[in-house]
Amino acid sequence: MNYLKLVHLFLAVTMMGTVMISCVKKEAPVRFAIASDFHAPDVPGGKERVETFIKAASDENVDFIIELGDFCRLDSASQVYRDVWNSFKGEKHHAIGNHDLDRYSVDEYVVGMGMPNRYYSFDKGNFHFVVLDGNNYSDGEEIHHYDHANYGKYPLSNHSYMDKEQMEWLEKDLASTDLKTVLLSHQSLE
């Protein structure tokens, strides 16, 4: 089986699982498709990977799609991947991954991808979704945001921190809702 077929199989089986969340029978389910680490401009068949995801999400008639980072660059050569992503007719969301900031500041990436902020929340059905940004590293004294691949000079044990500002925002955001909450992030939350 060639690499492209393996990528498509991987997408179909693991990355493209449409997630249905419903805890009480009376509630309408919220259906969304989630993907991460497309690395679209850097892998063979990057455009086809995104197209496969969008087609599957459209076929499943999901309420929204979200990618959890390491998607594509903001340069004109990567516009094709953003166009495929934006071809989805429904609601679309992004989280920022570490490699999304290899060439950009967080502000450049947020604006370039049309995100409301580097972390944000939204409600869908009876659920509250929180998109977090774990793209921070510690230099041993302070927490700094990733910016133009600056995270590479520190060991992995110093990566993936949530900054104080974001944690304070998260505390207020969670206190403001009674809905069941789903946290989404490129990095693991430990």
Task: Place the predicted regions along the sequence by residue.
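Glycine-rich phosphate-binding loop signature in dinucleotide/nucleotide-binding domains
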Residues: 57-61, 173-178
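Extended active-site neighborhood of metal-dependent phosphoesterases/phosphodiesterases
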Residues: 77-177
